[in-house]
């Protein structure tokens, strides 16, 4: 099986697909699957951009809306995770995973699927210690704080992934596992990105939860993005001989190293995305403790999943493990017509409803972030006695902002020298 790996998509689907098709023509081959490591930007219309953590002057519709509307269809099956520049309102609709457009599958905030017999897991978002122990309290419309915190990784989702026992072939994360630079050419990386040096030397560059998952899951491959550079490493796990090949890739821009093709052993095709039995059993077991408020949540003890797994297996066999079909929940962007503001903030996605019905679980995604009860009042209008944070207190966790500052400094030095 030939798999294309892409770093940060930033909504530029057209160019990524064209690049892959060019590769196929040159090498007279067929790529079976595209994996994207976050910052996918599944923006369906103008209103979605209000949930995108990008400075307003840089917000663009890009090309995903064409695939959402059906004007275009992804030429290659595509699986993606979320990063820190996403239409977070749409990804919340698909918290458990699902088709974001025809032939384009979102793994969820955490998730595992099979493509053929290749098992692929992933964790969306980036690590921020402040919100790691919180529940998923954010709801659209987001404010200056929640538009950032909504994509911060939560312990709940990590603990679900930590329950996995069956081997994974591939794992995707947006930010890198902390310490991964010890296993590759860190000196070359620091020459390329000198402002990473302090974090590399202090071993704070990257995600602590991702490092825990790397140690536990030991996938054959681990792919990341976020830091906008290509970096390879190989992690030897103990004495059992298992090795994880790590690769981070850049964003989709001319001259950037944003794409890599790998070949992985697999059964012969045709291939399709399928639900993973073990993962859905874990999802079913953990849903009763799904944390939906700010307060600290300890989710480390959820018990065995065996009984849940047997129940899930019977249900999945009835539908041959196939995910539910893609369904649009809001109008797609139309260059000649404005989207109406009457679109609900949190539409109930039919895929999510169908999956929860299959698993015998309640729908909780429109619950109040304060009480955990369902409400039609937007979270931003709900009363709360919890502290609010000034924007200056919020740490910079966006690599784009860091790069912009460094490029500005470089420009200043150039002007000074001129």
From Swiss-Prot:
It is an enzyme of class 3 (hydrolase). One of its GO terms (biological process) is embryo development ending in seed dormancy. Its EC number is 3.1.4.-. Binds 2 divalent metal cations per subunit. Residues 407-418 have a biased composition (Basic and acidic residues). One of its GO terms (molecular function) is metal ion binding. Pfam families: DBR1 (PF05011), Metallophos (PF00149). The keyword Iron-sulfur does not apply. Residues 372-418 are annotated as: Disordered. Widely expressed. Expressed in roots, stems, cauline and rosette leaves, flower buds and siliques. Keywords: Developmental protein, Hydrolase, Iron, Manganese, Metal-binding, mRNA processing, Nucleus, Zinc. Its cofactor is Fe(2+); Zn(2+); Mn(2+). Residues 390-406 have a biased composition (Acidic residues). It is found in: Nucleus. InterPro entries: Calcineurin-like_PHP_ApaH, DBR1_C, Dbr1_N, Metallo-depent_PP-like. Residues 124-154 are annotated as: Lariat recognition loop. Coiled coil: none annotated. A divalent metal cation 2 binds at residues 39, 84, 174, 226. Cleaves the 2'-5' phosphodiester linkage at the branch point of lariat intron pre-mRNAs after splicing and converts them into linear molecules that are subsequently degraded. It thereby facilitates ribonucleotide turnover. It may also participate in retrovirus replication via an RNA lariat intermediate in cDNA synthesis. Plays en essential role during embryogenesis. Belongs to the lariat debranching enzyme family. This is Lariat debranching enzyme. It comes from Arabidopsis thaliana (Mouse-ear cress).
């Amino acid at each position: 099986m030939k798999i294309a790996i892409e770093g940060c998509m930033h909504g530029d689907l057209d160019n990524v697909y064209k690049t892959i098709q060019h590769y196929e023509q040159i090498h007279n081959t067929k790529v079976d699957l595209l994996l994207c490591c976050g910052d996918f930007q599944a923006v369906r219309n103008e209103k979605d951009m209000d949930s995108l953590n990008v400075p307003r002057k840089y917000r663009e519709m890009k090309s995903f809306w064409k695939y959402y509307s059906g004007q275009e269809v992804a030429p290659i099956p595509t699986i993606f995770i979320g990063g820190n520049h996403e239409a977070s309102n749409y990804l919340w609709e698909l918290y458990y995973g699902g088709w974001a457009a025809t032939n384009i599958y979102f793994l969820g905030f955490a998730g595992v699927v099979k493509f053929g017999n290749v098992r692929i897991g992933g964790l969306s978002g980036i690590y921020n210690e402040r919100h790691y122990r919180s529940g998923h309290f954010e709801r659209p419309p987001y404010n200056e704080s929640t538009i950032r915190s909504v994509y911060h990784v939560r312990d709940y989702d990590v603990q679900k992934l930590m329950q996995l026992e069956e081997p994974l072939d591939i794992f995707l994360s947006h930010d890198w596992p902390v310490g991964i630079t010890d296993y590759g050419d860190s000196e070359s990386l620091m020459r390329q990105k000198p402002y990473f040096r302090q974090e590399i030397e202090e071993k704070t560059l990257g995600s602590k939860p991702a490092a825990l998952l790397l140690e536990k899951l030991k996938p054959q491959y681990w792919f990341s993005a976020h830091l906008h550079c290509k970096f390879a490493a190989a992690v030897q796990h103990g004495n059992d001989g298992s090795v994880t090949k790590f690769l981070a890739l850049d964003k989709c821009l001319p001259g950037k190293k944003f794409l890599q093709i790998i070949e992985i052993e697999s059964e012969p095709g045709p291939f399709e995305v399928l639900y993973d039995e073990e993962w859905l059993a874990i999802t079913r077991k953990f849903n009763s403790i799904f944390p939906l408020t700010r307060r600290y949540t300890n989710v480390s003890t959820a018990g065995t999943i065996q009984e849940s797994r047997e129940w899930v297996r019977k249900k999945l066999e009835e539908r041959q493990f196939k995910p539910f079909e893609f369904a649009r929940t809001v109008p797609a962007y139309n260059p000649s017509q404005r989207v109406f503001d009457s679109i609900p903030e949190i539409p109930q996605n039919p895929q999510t409803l169908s999956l929860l019905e299959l698993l015998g679980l309640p729908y909780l995604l429109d619950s109040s972030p304060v009480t955990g009860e369902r409400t039609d009042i937007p979270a931003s209008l709900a009363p709360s006695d919890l502290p609010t944070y000034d924007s200056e207190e919020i740490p910079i966790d966006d690599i784009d902002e860091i790069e912009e500052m460094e490029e500005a400094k470089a420009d200043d030095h150039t002007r000074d020298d001129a």
